[in-house]
Amino acid sequence: MKIESKLENNALLIHVNFNATEKIEDLEEFKLLVQSSGLIPQHVVQTTRNTPTAKYFIGTGKLTEIKELLNHDPVSVILVNHNLSPAQSRNLEAALGCRVIDRTELILDIFAQRARTFEGMLQVELAQLKHLSTRLVRGWTHLERQKGGIGLRGPGEAQLETDRRLIKKRISTINARLDKVAEQRNQNRRARQNQRTPCVALIGYTNAGKSTLFNRLTRSEVYVADQLFATLDPTSRRCYIPELGNIILIDTVGFIRHLPPDLVKAFKATLEETIQADLLLHVIDQHDPKRHEQKEAVRDIIDELGAGDLPMLEVYNKIDLLPGTTAETYSDENGKPVRVQLSSRSGEGIPLLYAALKDLLSNTVE
């Protein structure tokens, strides 16, 4: 039972600025998410509120404005840069006569498009099903097809109960399969540990340049694109570090602020590869003005995974986009490198990264 990505092209974006700073979502980042999903942001509607309304999330005045806009220039889908309750989604769809997708659903859809491995597809489906289980009253008559009309009555209680049982059964099946995959990964991990090959995990905010750095270090060709979540399935390669020897380098999925909890849980087994690493390379886009917030978002997820105490080297990437910025290494009071500035694309600063890796990993090599 695969829940397919069904997003179409033209979209209207709704962004609400709240006075409470912890609830503010970055609009530009949301536009990147939308574009990464394959949608075209045809309209962007912004509004400011102290709190969301219980019924529509937005106020009735803004709702009327959107209705009039859609009457003149309709779109295939409405995207809200916030997480909606099932009732809010249902009410917006009924009022606007158009499919409504919130931030969590959009990210899940992007992940559904990106997953390529058996494990990745299972993990995405698991997250989708958990999210869907709270929203069966809208958009689904049963699990084999999605309801075509918008704002129609939901399925009967008997059918809903059947759907819930089917979802619960499928979730159980997926978890069992993921457990088997996790055991195989554990065996591979133990084999690496027996060989005493240092393991380094690349982590970072989505689109920070992890895959470009991965390709530079391993001389491989992992898919790279200027879009969010270009890399979803983890990739590991053996690579040679001068004066150190071979290491195992792991490229992981990029993080984002307010990553859906169900998605974090579904990918926890994959992300736990980072917990077993000897060193984390935290790749940061030095060119991005939001880099400090992004850095904290990544650290929050790493802490949640229980990897907050692992040795970490910060890699400030994309210095080629900053005129006057040069490759450089920063060390702590003990002389240990804590930060390297470089360009994965041009290769400037890569020798400094090699030296830092040699310094930090020399005690892990027999």
Predicted regions and their residues:
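Short hydrophobic segments within beta-strands
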Residues: I14-V16, I203, V315
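Conserved C-terminal guanine-recognition region of P-loop GTPase G domains, centered on the G4
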Residues: L27-L33, K67-H72, L84-C98, L244-G245, ...
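Alpha-helical coiled-coil heptad-repeat register
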Residues: Q123-L126, K130-S133, V137-W140, E161, ...
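Flexible beta-alpha connector loops of hexameric P-loop NTPases
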Residues: F18-E22, P52-Y56, R114-E119, Q159, ...
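N-terminal accessory targeting/assembly segments
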Residues: M1-D109
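Conserved G1/Walker A P-loop phosphate-binding module
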Residues: K6-E8, R145-P261, T274-I275
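Residue-level signature of catalytic and energy-coupling elements of molecular machines
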Residues: F30, I78, L129, I167, ...
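Canonical P-loop GTPase G-domain recognition
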Residues: G97-G148, L310-L313, D320-E366
